[in-house]
């Protein structure tokens, strides 16, 4: 074998070639063909030394990236990556090769800089690995060498498979098509070992998945198997059977995991194996029988799979292999599916079940395991099966949604919305209809608890999906949302599920997750691995001592002895011992019970537990089960060396049923063991134990650091994959979710809308100017189309802030306030969930990340949705601009809109694609059809999004499952290092695989009688040598779902109880340390035969305020049934118990000393409603079942049940009675219908005992502590009014310190009255005048406030002043007599300072020239302080349209910007309709429906749109002529003048013409009408007439012909001819068709010019886009306006008018931006005033408009011109301010006054300003140089440089660059110390050319200058 081992570097021995084998990212075919083919033996060598891709390895980027990556990890980049843990020597070799390659690159490839790098190749991106972004480098595969694979054989299978799964080199290794035999054999060995790992299933799947698709399986292995036949060397042939066994094992694993996708490759290999085996056998090689059996098994499986493949039933890898049936034809429980099958649901198959044997032994361990597996599975399957069958039979019932089912809960219209990433994998957000569930109180409901199983189907359960509840948030449930995790089989079907698919979901109440883990554990455990079979299965009553005691171990009990003197006595009693260790099997050597602080039975239990391998300890209530259990653990931990007999640690496993019990037990252990504890279970309430939870231990830095390297590498690798997948998946999932939260914007659906429908949608009916309003460009056409736009409901997009939420949720807030004022009660749902959820599995995201995700989701919704249901608004910018209230809807309108959209989105009916294709105009559809079409588009969008994220979903799920297995490996390391591992039964079920690895030798089960036997068995491993069960089977039993299984099949009998019943030895604790004797009497002898009282309970004090420590109050008030949860409540009992609790609180008992128990959840919340937190905070309220193991001083018990039918429910169960009656220490008071309960035998005995001791009756006797002789009887809540303060009805009569008597009734609390507040009047004299205090007695007396007359010294007025206030301190209230500066009288009182601002109204003249009343005090501010007053005077200016301006002086900006004219336009449009818009100068296109029509059809477009010409043949024909043109073309026939020969209805001849429609008038019958003169020829006897079809008027034909054909020279307007009588346009008339068509053609030409051709519009649109991009100042200073213009230009279907509007906006906004930019050159005060003016212009410009009117353009241009002059003037003045003479300053001020006038800037003003500015140019500088123009010219001339040498720094200081003008060095500005100049002819970025100095357009040294020079210099050269 050694001779055949390949050379380590896989190269020829004497070769030094640098060739490396292929890696993951193989070369493209073209590159591969160009490469040199490596020698065959190089590939056969298998594993060349690890390295990167040959190309990637030889360029500097790969090297430096590697260096940087290693430095970032804090390691030397030249160190080997895997030599930290002392791995095999091949890793050091890897390091050397890496270093050699790096050195080789540095020394031998220096010329690579001059070569083209590989990433510059066009084909380089083809090398990317799947799902890798183009910018990322492919991760390089580290090759797996021979030595490395050999080292893996020495390691644990788990480490092997994790290492292979996370290595990129595995795929490369298995990709070779040939390799040496010994290398192939080693690979098979390693793969077989990897696949043997049981805890790493996902890693095994990953490795097998690579193997399945590899050349290793398809080529290498078949060649190897065939080669066995011809192998000549005997030694090698003898080793083949072992290798064949490895291959068969791999094949078996492959077909079991991938039955569908691997059957072809494996079948070929299997067909070759028999031939090779026969050849080997023939050559004398011994073939083991097991190998042949395994091969036969694989052959059988493959034959079965091939048959199924031919049948077409083998399609996916989730196919379940059929196992052969057992001899008795009963399916083996090991192959039974955990989930229900189709046959179980539909065929109602009766399952094969055996009862749990509780009175004898089992025949075998196999039957024992089978029995418990089937019973446990049936316990959760039966309710689901029977519920679904009942549901299927009820589908035709009309009241199905209201019907209640016994076994299941139903959720209608359930939809799988979106996948979500969680730590456990992929979960799905599912939404169901909440309408039938309005009555559900989710915070208490047991619906949809964590771990509950749901079944979903959309085809009446012909197919179904299974899932479990993975997360339950109350807020989400109220909205019908829950998160589900689907099982593996269902996940395969989810790819085809869309968010629009509607399912029926049913829920079974069982905690399925616990069932699943236990059932899987029972299937996996082998019969021989079940411990204690002699006792558990065979029921042998002889129990041996633990095996580890047979080694002679001795115990030290001194740590258990608390008293030092007792320790000494114990040591003296143990004669001959030099140390305190004893033989525990010898009872005589044990310390005394007094020394150990134990009673007799506890001592017996301790001895029994430590000396028997199976110890059962029964502990009745209060007997100290936990105390004894802790003593046992302390003894075991102290003597760990006795049972830890190997180097490997084996912790003690403690299992408890509830989290509370686990906390109690572990806290007790902590008192004697401060370290090495691990807690696994639900969230702990213990601060002490939080440090020992798995989550905390995992997060410790030391733990991470000490983890094996292969786990750390795997963690990083998988985490990276998860993050990448999560990022992509999250975005897609949130997109899917958004589709159900509102209406999508149309642009996101465009891809799924046909072009015809898109054009129709976007060119929809424009009936309101707001549709195309400039400010509503972001408005959604989709909303309008769906009837949700401004035409139907006004849009409100203000977020659901406090002001909106308060209105919308007023009722909820009130309810919330009421809830918050009540005491906190642990919700039953929360309690159940707390025991189900393992804390380590809870996902706790940082609050910061939650906020970030929420913000990102909000942004995504804002981007995608035109209307959001959560905001009930559009979510558009347009909507937000209207948040001032203009578009606010009423609250009920919002609700209607929200409900309407929500209902439509949840509907299932959609339009089919065929139906959609038949639609031409989507606006012609009714609203219902529109929503159907929208849902079709939405489904296409959702399906596409779902497809995109599907691959990421699969990647994340696989990675998460591998990560979960990795976590288990981490947890395994934690648990193995512990001394004590504490688990709940749920935790033990979930961590069963780890427990099998941890192999705890000692298992202690607390509350063992409450645990199902199957759960206990699944917790045990074959390594268990000592099992201690502690519990009490006479208290609560395990809970089963199915009553039949619990009672008739004994499923509810725990292992604890069964072993007791079959006479396995056990010890019962006999002394109770909890209850006073009166209470204990109820349990003995009725429940426990000989339960004795410990002396400590005889010392309890009596309960205050009552005559007895124990009393049962009888009543017969009926109960009430609660609809949800099948619970009950009793209002009478609730009120009584609450009042009794309040009474005990008055006896000065602490709230923590009182517990209220009830037997039903419904009563729990009935009680809560009666208990305000202010009074009852601290009182605990529980249901009995959740209080086992607890105790309190006083227990108040409400039994609830009281009905005429005598149904007592589970009050007849002795176990529950035991728990209920044994929780009290000192006092217990119960209320119930004892007459009904007496029918139960046990209750009858208890009631008899109570009656014997006078402790039962209709009334409870209360005893007053202050008046012992006074008793009060209470039977109902109202009776407690007799003792309002907890004493009696007598008055208190206690004399208080103030002298008054206590006014309360007798009260036992606050006997010294320190807290009492006397409420009687005080009446103390508090001043010299004899006035008395008006306050109540307990309040502190205040200064006298009685008013008396006093004279105020400052003014002499007499005032009524409070007695205690001195006259000098009082403010006189007489009116002030002083006059203000303005002359008006002061309005303040005399004692106050005079007013600063006079409030008298005076009329003043404003700056605008108008007079207006203002407050007198504001006048000065108006004149000098800049105070503004809005002038309300009507403007009245005659606008350009001729109408008076409707605005006010203020709204028109003092005449500078007039408001739009609001008069109706009423001008005739080209289509002959009157304009319906306000008078705005330029009429918009007509929005009416077009009335053009012909005989074939009518135009359906808007009147202002281009009509489509009719292409039907013209129908104008008669017997003389016929037109041969198309209907829309001018006719090619003349009019016919032959009289019509037809007769009218009246019998007279027609008066019309041949071929024309006959007029309806008769010359004889309607003579007056026909001969009425209009044109002048109507009364001629042979006159012929034509009737107009548009208005039915008739005219003489010759006159009408002339009228229709005449062309008047003065006719300017182009419009249709109209009826001479009624003026109706003539549109349809065949005789005058040519004339009409000519007019219509002219009108169409005008329409086209108005709208513009598509080419012109596109050209203009691109021109404006380019123009806008050049406006850098606009982009910088007005970014929102820039973005708005950019978005508008990006829209489709813009008209010429739209583009004209945009062009105007660009121009005006650009001017504004330039002016804004110039503000920095002014004085601060001037800047503020000009900025205000600019903001006014910007505000006016931002108003919504379709176009600018001529008036607006005039006003705007004039104002911008004024501001331009003003800015120019003020800038010049600022620049030369210090050098300006007084005369020039006066001139500047005069120009400024003209420019700052409030009225409009006229042409006269402009001319005057121009003249003055020309005069000022010579003396004021034109730029920021601070010098005059003359001085600038002189300086430039003196320096003498050509243009382009002058520059300025960041702050505008000028400097010059000599020589060529290009910057070659940096310097410092002497004025501001900023950087100036530059390097390499490149100017510093903060500097720029100072064109204001010499007029240069570019620098002297620049590309532009070098190519073109400065333009003027070129001109000079010419």
Curated annotation (Swiss-Prot):
Widely expressed. Residues 1-58, 75-140, 796-819, 876-896 are annotated as: Disordered. Zn(2+) binds at residues 1849, 1853, 1869, 1872. A zinc finger (NF-X1-type) spans 1298-1320, 1330-1346, 1382-1400, 1441-1463, 1471-1488, 1546-1564. Residues 286-313, 886-967, 1741-1820 form a coiled coil. One of its GO terms (biological process) is innate immune response. It is found in: Mitochondrion outer membrane; Cytoplasm, Stress granule. Keywords: Antiviral defense, Coiled coil, Cytoplasm, Disease variant, Immunity, Innate immunity, Membrane, Metal-binding, Mitochondrion, Mitochondrion outer membrane, Repeat, RNA-binding, Zinc, Zinc-finger. Residues 1-12, 82-105 have a biased composition (Basic and acidic residues). Residues 120-129, 877-887 have a biased composition (Polar residues). Residues 30-42 have a biased composition (Low complexity). InterPro entries: ARM-type_fold, DNA2/NAM7-like, DNA2/NAM7-like_C, DNA2/NAM7_AAA_11, P-loop_NTPase, SF1_C_Upf1, ZF_RZ_dom, Znf_NFX1. Pfam families: AAA_11, AAA_12, ZnF_RZ-type, ZNFX1. One of its GO terms (cellular component) is cytoplasmic stress granule. GO terms for molecular function: helicase activity; RNA binding; zinc ion binding. A zinc finger (RZ-type) spans 1827-1898. Signal peptide: none annotated. Residues 809-819 have a biased composition (Acidic residues). It is linked to Immunodeficiency 91 and hyperinflammation: An autosomal recessive disorder characterized by immunodeficiency, recurrent infections, and hyperinflammation with systemic involvement. Most patients eventually develop hepatic or renal failure, may have compromised neurologic function, lymphadenopathy or hepatosplenomegaly. Early death often occurs due to multiorgan failure. RNA-binding protein that initiates the antiviral response and is required to restrict the replication of RNA viruses. Acts as a double-stranded RNA (dsRNA) sensor that recognizes viral RNA and then interacts with MAVS to initiate the type I interferon response. Also required for immunity against some bacteria, such as mycobacteria. Belongs to the ZNFX1 family. PANTHER family: DNA2/NAM7 HELICASE FAMILY (PTHR10887), NFX1-TYPE ZINC FINGER-CONTAINING PROTEIN 1 (PTHR10887:SF341). Interacts with MAVS. This is NFX1-type zinc finger-containing protein 1.
């Amino acid at each position: 074998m050694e001779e055949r081992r390949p050379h380590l570097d896989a190269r020829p021995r004497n070769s030094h070639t640098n060739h490396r084998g292929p890696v993951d990212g193989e070369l493209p075919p073209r590159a591969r063909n160009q490469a040199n083919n490596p020698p065959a033996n190089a590939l056969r060598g298998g594993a060349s030394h690890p390295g990167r891709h040959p190309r990637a390895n030889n360029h500097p980027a790969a090297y430096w990236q590697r260096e940087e990556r290693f430095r970032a990890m804090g390691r030397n980049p030249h160190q080997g990556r895997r030599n930290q843990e002392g791995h095999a020597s091949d890793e050091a070799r890897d390091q050397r090769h890496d270093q050699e390659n790096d050195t080789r690159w540095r020394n031998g490839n220096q010329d690579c800089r001059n070569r083209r790098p590989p990433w510059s190749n066009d084909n380089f991106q083809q090398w990317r690995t799947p799902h890798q972004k183009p910018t990322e480098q492919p991760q390089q595969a580290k090759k797996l060498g021979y030595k490395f694979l050999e080292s893996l054989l020495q390691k644990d299978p788990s480490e092997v498979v994790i290492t292979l799964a996370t290595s990129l080199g595995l795929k490369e290794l298995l990709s070779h098509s040939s390799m040496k035999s010994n290398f192939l054999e080693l690979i098979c060995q390693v793969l077989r070992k990897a696949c043997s790992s049981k805890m790493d299933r996902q890693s095994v799947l990953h490795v097998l998945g690579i193997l399945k698709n590899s050349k290793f399986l398809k080529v290498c292995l078949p060649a190897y198997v065939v080669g066995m036949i011809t192998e000549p060397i005997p030694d090698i042939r003898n080793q083949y059977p072992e290798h064949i066994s490895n291959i068969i094992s791999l094949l078996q694993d492959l077909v079991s995991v991938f039955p569908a996708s691997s059957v072809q490759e494996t079948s070929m290999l299997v067909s070759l194996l028999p031939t090779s085996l026969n050849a080997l056998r023939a050559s004398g090689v011994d073939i083991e029988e097991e190998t042949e059996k395994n091969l036969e098994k694989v052959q059988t499986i493959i034959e079965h799979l091939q048959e199924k493949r031919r049948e077409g039933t083998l399609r996916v890898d989730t196919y379940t292999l059929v196992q052969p049936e057992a001899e008795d034809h009963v399916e083996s429980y090991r192959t039974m599916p955990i989930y229900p099958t189709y046959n179980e649901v539909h065929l109602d198959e009766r399952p094969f079940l055996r009862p749990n044997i509780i009175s004898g032994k089992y025949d075998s361990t196999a039957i024992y395991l089978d029995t418990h597996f089937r019973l446990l599975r049936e316990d959760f399957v039966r309710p689901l099966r029977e519920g679904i069958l009942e549901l299927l039979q009820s589908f035709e019932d009309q009241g199905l949604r209201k019907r209640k089912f016994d076994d299941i809960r139903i959720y209608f219209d359930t939809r799988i919305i979106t996948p979500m990433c969680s730590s456990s994998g992929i979960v799905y957000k599912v939404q169901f209809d909440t309408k039938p569930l309005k009555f559900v109180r989710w915070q208490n409901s047991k619906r949809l608890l964590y771990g509950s199983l749901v079944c979903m189907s959309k085809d009446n359960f012909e197919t179904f999906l299974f899932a479990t509840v993975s997360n339950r948030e109350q807020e989400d449930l109220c909205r019908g949302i829950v998160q589900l995790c689907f099982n593996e089989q269902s996940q395969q079907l989810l790819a085809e599920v869309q968010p629009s698919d509607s399912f029926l979901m049913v829920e079974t109440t069982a905690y399925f997750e616990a069932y699943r883990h236990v059932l899987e554990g029972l299937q996996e455990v082998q019969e021989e691995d079940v411990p204690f079979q002699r006792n558990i299965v065979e029921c042998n009553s002889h129990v041996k001592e633990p095996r580890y005691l047979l080694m002679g171990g001795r115990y030290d009990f001194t740590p258990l002895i608390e008293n030092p003197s007792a320790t000494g006595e114990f040591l003296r009693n143990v004669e001959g011992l030099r140390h305190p260790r004893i033989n525990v099997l010898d009872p005589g050597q044990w310390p005394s019970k007094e020394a150990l602080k134990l009673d007799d039975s506890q001592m017996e239990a301790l001895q029994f537990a430590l000396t028997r391998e199976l110890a059962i300890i029964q502990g009745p209530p209060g007997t100290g089960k936990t105390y004894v259990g802790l003593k046992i653990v302390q003894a075991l931990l102290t003597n760990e060396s006795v049972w830890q007999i190997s180097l490997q640690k084996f912790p003690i496993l403690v299992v408890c049923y509830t989290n509370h019990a686990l906390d109690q037990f572990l806290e007790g252990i902590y008192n004697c063991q401060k370290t090495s504890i691990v807690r696994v279970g639900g969230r702990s309430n213990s601060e002490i134990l939080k440090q020992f939870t798995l989550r905390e231990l995992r997060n410790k830095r030391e733990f991470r650091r000490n983890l094996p390297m292969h786990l750390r590498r795997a963690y990083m690798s998988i985490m990276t994959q998860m993050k990448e997948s999560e990022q992509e998946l999250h975005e897609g999932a949130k997109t899917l979710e958004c589709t159900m939260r509102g209406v999508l914007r149309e642009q996101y659906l465009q891809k799924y809308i046909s072009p015809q429908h898109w054009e129709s949608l976007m060119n929809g009916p424009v009936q309101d100017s707001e549709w195309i309003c400039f400010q509503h460009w972001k408005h959604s056409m989709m909303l309008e189309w769906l009837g949700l736009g401004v035409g139907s409901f006004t849009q409100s997009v203000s977020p659901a802030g406090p002001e909106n939420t308060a209105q919308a949720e007023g009722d909820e807030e009130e309810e919330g306030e009421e809830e918050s004022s009540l005491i906190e009660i642990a919700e039953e749902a929360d309690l159940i969930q707390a025991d189900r959820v393992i804390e380590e599995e809870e996902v706790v995201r940082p609050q910061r990340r939650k906020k970030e995700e929420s913000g990102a989701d909000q942004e995504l919704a804002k981007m995608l949705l035109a209307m959001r249901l959560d905001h009930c608004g559009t979510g558009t910018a347009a909507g937000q601009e209207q948040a001032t209230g203009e578009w606010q809807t009423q609250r009920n309108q919002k609700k209607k809109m929200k409900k309407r959209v929500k209902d439509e989105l949840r509907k299932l009916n959609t339009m089919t694609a065929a139906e959609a294709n038949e639609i031409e105009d989507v606006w012609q559809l009714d609203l219902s059809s529109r929503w159907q079409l929208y849902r079709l588009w939405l489904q296409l969008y959702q399906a596409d999004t779902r497809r995109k994220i599907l691959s990421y979903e699969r990647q994340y799920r696989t990675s998460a499952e591998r990560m979960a297995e990795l976590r288990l490996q981490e947890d395994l390391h934690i648990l193995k290092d512990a001394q004590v591992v504490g688990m709940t039964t749920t935790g033990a079920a979930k961590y069963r695989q780890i427990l099998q690895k941890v192999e705890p030798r000692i298992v202690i089960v607390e509350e063992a009688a409450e645990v199902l036997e199957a759960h206990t068995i699944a917790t045990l491993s074959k390594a268990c040598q000592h099992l201690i069960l502690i519990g009490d089977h006479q208290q609560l039993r395990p809970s089963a779902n199915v009553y039949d299984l619990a009672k008739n099949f004994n499923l509810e009998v725990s292992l604890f109880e069964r072993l007791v019943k079959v006479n396995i030895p056990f010890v019962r604790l006999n002394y109770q340390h909890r209850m006073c004797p009166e209470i204990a009497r109820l349990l003995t002898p009725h429940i426990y035969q000989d339960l004795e009282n410990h002396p400590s309970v005889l010392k309890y004090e009596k309960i205050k305020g009552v005559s007895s420590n124990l009393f049962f109050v009888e009543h017969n008030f009926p109960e009430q049934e609660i609809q949800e949860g099948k619970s009950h409540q009793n209002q009478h009992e609730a009120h009584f118990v609450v009042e009794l609790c309040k009474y005990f609180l008055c006896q000065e008992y602490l709230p923590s000393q009182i517990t209220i128990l009830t037997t039903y959840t419904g009563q729990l919340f009935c009680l809560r409603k009666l208990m305000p937190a202010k009074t009852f905070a601290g009182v605990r309220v529980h249901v009995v079942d959740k209080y086992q193991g607890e105790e309190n001083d006083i227990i108040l018990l409400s039994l609830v049940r009281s009905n005429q039918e005598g149904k007592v429910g589970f009050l007849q169960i002795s176990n529950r009675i035991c728990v209920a009656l044994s929780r009290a220490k000192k006092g217990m008071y119960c209320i119930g219908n004892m007459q009904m309960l007496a029918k139960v035998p046990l209750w009858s005995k208890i009631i008899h005992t109570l009656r014997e001791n006078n402790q039962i009756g209709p009334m409870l006797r209360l005893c007053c502590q202050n008046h012992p002789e006074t008793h009060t009887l209470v039977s109902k809540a109202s009776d407690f009014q007799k003792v309002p303060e907890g004493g009696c009805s007598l008055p208190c009569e206690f004399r208080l310190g103030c002298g008054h008597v206590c006014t309360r009734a007798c009260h036992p609390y606050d006997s010294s009255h320190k807290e009492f507040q006397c409420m009687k009047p005080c009446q103390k004299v508090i001043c010299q005048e004899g006035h008395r205090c008006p306050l109540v007695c307990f309040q502190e007396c205040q200064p006298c406030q009685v008013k008396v007359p006093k004279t105020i010294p400052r003014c002499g007025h007499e005032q009524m002043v409070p007695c205690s206030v001195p006259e000098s301190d009082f403010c006189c209230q007489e009116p002030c007599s002083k006059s203000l500066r303005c002359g008006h009288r002061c309005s303040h009182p005399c004692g106050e300072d005079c007013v600063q601002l006079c409030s008298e109204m005076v009329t003043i003249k404003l700056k605008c020239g108008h007079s207006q009343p203002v407050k007198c005090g504001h006048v000065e501010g108006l004149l000098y302080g800049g105070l503004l007053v809005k002038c309300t005077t009507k403007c009245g200016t005659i606008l350009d349209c001729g109408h008076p301006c409707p605005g006010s002086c203020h709204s028109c900006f003092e005449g500078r910007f007039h408001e739009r004219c609001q008069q109706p336009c009423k001008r005739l449009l080209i289509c002959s309709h009157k304009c319906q818009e306000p008078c705005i100068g330029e009429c918009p296109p007509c929005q009416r429906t077009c009335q053009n029509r012909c005989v074939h059809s009518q135009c359906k477009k808007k009147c202002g749109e281009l009509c489509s010409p009719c292409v039907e043949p013209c129908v104008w024909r008669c017997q003389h002529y016929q037109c041969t043109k198309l209907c829309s073309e001018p006719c090619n026939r003349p009019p016919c003048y032959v009289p019509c020969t037809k007769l009218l209805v009246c019998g007279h001849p027609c008066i019309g013409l041949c071929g024309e429609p006959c007029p309806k008038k008769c010359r004889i019958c309607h003579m007056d009408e026909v001969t009425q003169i209009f044109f002048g020829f109507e009364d001629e006897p042979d006159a012929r007439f034509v009737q107009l079809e548009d208005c039915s008027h008739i005219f003489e034909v010759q006159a009408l012909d002339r009228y229709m054909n005449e062309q008047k020279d003065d006719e300017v307007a182009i419009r249709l001819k109209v009826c001479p009588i009624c003026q109706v346009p003539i549109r349809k008339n065949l005789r005058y068709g040519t004339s009409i068509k000519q007019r219509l053609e002219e009108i169409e030409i005008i329409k086209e010019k108005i709208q513009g051709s598509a080419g012109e519009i596109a050209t203009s649109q691109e021109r404006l886009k380019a123009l806008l991009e050049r406006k850098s100042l606009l982009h910088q200073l007005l970014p929102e306006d820039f973005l708005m213009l950019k978005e508008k230009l990006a829209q489709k279907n813009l008209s010429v008018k739209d583009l004209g509007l945009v062009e105007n906006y660009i121009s005006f906004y650009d001017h504004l931006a330039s002016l804004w930019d110039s503000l920095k050159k002014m004085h601060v005060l001037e800047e503020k005033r000009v900025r205000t003016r600019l903001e006014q212009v910007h505000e006016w410009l931002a108003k919504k408009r379709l176009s600018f009117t001529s008036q607006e353009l005039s006003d705007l241009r004039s104002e911008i011109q004024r501001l331009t002059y003003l800015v120019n003037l003020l800038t010049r003045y600022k620049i030369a301010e210090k050098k300006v003479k007084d005369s020039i300053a006066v001139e500047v001020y005069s120009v400024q006054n003209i420019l700052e006038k409030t009225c409009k800037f006229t042409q006269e003003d402009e001319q005057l300003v121009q003249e003055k500015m020309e005069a000022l140019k010579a003396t004021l500088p034109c730029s920021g140089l601070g010098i005059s123009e003359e001085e600038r010219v002189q300086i430039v001339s003196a320096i003498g440089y050509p243009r382009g040498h002058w520059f300025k720094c960041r702050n505008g200081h000028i400097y010059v660059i000599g020589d060529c003008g290009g910057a070659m060095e940096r310097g410092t500005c002497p004025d501001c110390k900023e950087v100036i100049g530059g390097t390499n002819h490149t100017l510093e970025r903060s500097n720029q050319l100072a064109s204001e100095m010499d007029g240069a357009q570019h620098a002297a040294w620049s590309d532009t200058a070098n190519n073109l020079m400065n333009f003027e210099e070129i001109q000079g050269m010419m």
